[in-house]
């Protein structure tokens, strides 16, 4: 079984594009935190991980319309590793979460004052 469940905050606004056939694809970066206890001073320690998520079709359209940086999000899907050659000819790899569904959690983040 290949199943991933994440809850975190969007680290950036989604990047949504359409393929030549008209299918929407959204790339999202989700930040999750793991609690690591407290340091000697009693301050909370945590580790932040950044995950690459990819959504297709209606999910991608929804992401483009309603998601923005800072939004708390539940996402589930499956892991997929892609590879490519960079400009120096090195083979690169990236593991992504292909999103099956997501839910908005909490209120919309406040706009920053200008």
Give the predicted meaning of each segment.
Residues 1-114:
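Single-stranded nucleic acid-binding surfaces, predominantly the OB-fold ssDNA-binding core
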């Amino acid at each position: 079984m290949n199943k991933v469940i994440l809850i975190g905050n969007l680290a950036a606004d989604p990047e949504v594009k359409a393929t030549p056939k008209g299918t929407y694809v959204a790339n999202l970066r989700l930040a999750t935190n793991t609690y690591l206890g407290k340091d000697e001073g009693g301050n909370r320690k945590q580790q932040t991980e950044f995950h690459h998520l990819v959504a297709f079709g209606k999910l991608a359209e929804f992401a483009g319309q309603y998601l923005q940086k800072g939004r708390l999000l539940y996402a589930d899907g499956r892991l997929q590793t892609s590879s490519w050659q960079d400009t120096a000819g090195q083979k690169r790899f990236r593991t992504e979460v292909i999103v099956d569904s997501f839910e908005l959690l909490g209120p919309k983040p406040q706009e920053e004052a200008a």
